[in-house]
């Protein structure tokens, strides 16, 4: 006994109606159970997309175009907050004497990639750090400098 031997129980299935195979079949000839004329009698009259409005000009064409989308040219940054840098210092993962670069942050798993890194100013920083990144928020700049550190913007 295997899957190829399995069959449905007697009477459990019904053969589908063979339409359009001549008048003698009882379901054939001219209109084949579809009624007479109209959209639903034609081929391809199945379910239409949800936005189809029956031939009326659809809403998205009636409403004027609006706005601008710069998505293809957007600059995406991997972000790290100063509180994360402070936590790494507290856990002695980072060394105060070594500069913090995008490569260091990527190696530690703070950011996924070192390609473009932006430092944001959430949290507090108490130790002086030399931080190098592609971009800094204004608050991050202030907090790093207040702690006695330095900020360097590296090229893309």
From Swiss-Prot:
Lineage: superkingdom: Bacteria
Record bears the keyword Nucleotide-binding: no
Keywords: Ribonucleoprotein, Ribosomal protein, RNA-binding, rRNA-binding
Keyword Secreted found: no
InterPro entries, alphabetized: Ribosomal_uL15, Ribosomal_uL15/eL18, Ribosomal_uL15/eL18_sf, Ribosomal_uL15_bac-type, Ribosomal_uL15_CS
Molecular-function annotations in GO: rRNA binding; structural constituent of ribosome
A Gene Ontology term for the protein's cellular component: cytosolic large ribosomal subunit
GO BP: any one term: translation
Residues covered by region (Disordered): 1-56
SUBUNIT field: Part of the 50S ribosomal subunit.
PANTHER family hit by this protein: 50S RIBOSOMAL PROTEIN L15 (PTHR12934), LARGE RIBOSOMAL SUBUNIT PROTEIN UL15M (PTHR12934:SF11)
Similarity-based family: Belongs to the universal ribosomal protein uL15 family.
Function: Binds to the 23S rRNA.
Protein name per its UniProtKB record: Large ribosomal subunit protein uL15
């Amino acid at each position: 006994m295997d899957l190829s031997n399995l069959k449905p129980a007697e009477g459990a299935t019904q053969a589908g109606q063979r339409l359009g195979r001549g008048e003698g079949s009882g379901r054939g000839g001219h209109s084949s159970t579809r009624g007479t004329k109209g959209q639903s009698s034609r081929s391809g009259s199945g379910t239409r997309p949800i936005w189809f409005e029956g031939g009326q000009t659809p809403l998205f064409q009636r409403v004027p175009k609006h706005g601008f989308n710069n998505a293809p040219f957007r600059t995406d940054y991997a972000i790290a907050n100063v509180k994360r840098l402070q936590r790494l210092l507290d856990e002695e993962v980072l060394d105060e004497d070594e500069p913090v670069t995008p490569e260091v942050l990527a190696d530690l798993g703070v950011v996924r990639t070192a390609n473009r890194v932006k430092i944001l100013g959430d949290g507090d920083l108490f130790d002086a750090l030399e931080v190098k990144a592609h971009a800094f928020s204004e608050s991050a700049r202030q907090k790093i400098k207040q702690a006695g550190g330095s900020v360097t913007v590296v090229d893309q």
